[in-house]
Amino acid sequence: MLFWLVLAIAVASLAARFYFGRDAEDRLAAGEAVDFAHLDLPSRDNAYLMCPADPLICNVKADEASPIFPVDPARLRDRWMEMAAAEPRVHLVGTEKDRQHLVYIQHSFFFRFPDIVTVEFLPTGNGRSTLALLSRSRYGKGDFGVNAARVGAWIAKLKALTEAGGNP
């Protein structure tokens, strides 16, 4: 009897989440905005941070150093937006700093759990640029490496796009 009650509650909870939560999950909640200079990441088990060594922008140690791209920040942003638009279940939910700071939400395939991806594009000089990137799960304590895999895949795609296109 208890099994069926727990199962019914779980099914009802998932159904309510799918029915009511879709639009709400595509917005940033209070406290989810990121300032790379003032990061507060209580848990790193469900997040992956990539930051440049120069210019130093992140106030916490990154999981990986950001690459330098052979394009200016505006072109890097344009290529990023092109790459992100081709990704499944990704929504641009915010922009700041003259569109140099972008926030996306990508939903998992089956349960549609939201992950928040924040990126900021930075000049390094001589027509080159880099970025600060944080991918994190909205829910849960661990992510089974999903955020690190996303960052790796997206950076590989971005490198291919920037090396193919370059500056005009």
Question: What role is predicted for each listed range?
Answer:
Residues 9-11:
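Hydrophobic alpha-helical transmembrane segments
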